[in-house]
Amino acid sequence: MDAVAVEPVRSSAVGLPAQLRDLGHQSYGPVWRAMQRFTDARDERTADEVWVVEHAPVFTLGQAGKPEHVLAPGDIPVLQVDRGGQVTYHGPGQLVVYPLLDLRRLKIGVRDYVCKIEQALIGMLDEWNIVAERRDGAPGVYVGGAKIAALGIRVRRGCTFHGLSLNVDMDLEPFHRINPCGYQGLQVTSVLDLGGPSGMDAVKAVLLEQLARQFGLVLQPASALPDLSLPA
């Protein structure tokens, strides 16, 4: 995956600085542990960060996840994780964004945080005339009843980790091996299937711009990756 352009991604007004890190292609586990370490170590002086990544194939079960919603995982690993929500799939061709934000600094609550992420996704899809919507009680973004983006977050001491996944140009077959987000028979779709671009960079740029606008951030690309080592 190509690196994000070096120019800062700005909101429409002067905003709070946040480090933007493009992790490329990574397994889920090391990134998850790195998010935990970052969140545990941060304090009120720590700058916010936004991480973008494509994961190797994996099913993740959130805190509300039920094993029976994993129908036939086959050769794809299943991980129990500490985010909210139920079961979802991550894989190549899916854009995953982890906003590591201090909600107290942004002066917003958890509900507003979720709504702003959903609105950023809706605004991004509108760039390609894809009409999307949110659903009460079912976080994420939907197009014509099919889910195109999933949300699963965790808030610790007022700071967020985990985040969103957007199906861009990917093999959707693994979603048939689960009840996505705990809903039997829930249909899923992708940006490409709805007439949008297949290129990850085009989608990434617009989504980051929308997220920066929603949260009032100035995203400053950082070349260094977080420590992705797993604990012994």
Curated annotation (Swiss-Prot):
Site note Lowers pKa of active site Cys, residues: 147
Q: Give the pathway listed in the UniProt entry for this protein.
A: Protein modification; protein lipoylation via endogenous pathway; protein N(6)-(lipoyl)lysine from octanoyl-[acyl-carrier-protein]: step 1/2
What catalytic activity does the UniProt entry give for this protein?
Answer: octanoyl-[ACP] + L-lysyl-[protein] = N(6)-octanoyl-L-lysyl-[protein] + holo-[ACP] + H(+)
What EC number(s) does its UniProt record assign? 2.3.1.181
Task: Give the positions the UniProt entry annotates as the active site.
Answer: 181
Question: Which residues does the annotation say bind substrate?
Answer: 83-90, 150-152, 163-165
Q: What InterPro entries does the database record attribute to this sequence?
A: aa-tRNA-synth_II/BPL/LPL (IPR045864), BPL_LPL_catalytic (IPR004143), Octanoyltransferase (IPR000544), Octanoyltransferase_CS (IPR020605)
Which GO cellular component does the record give, naming just one?
cytoplasm
Question: Locate the BPL/LPL catalytic domain: which residues?
Answer: 44-219
What does the sequence similarity comment in the record state about its family? Belongs to the LipB family.
| Protein name as catalogued | Octanoyltransferase
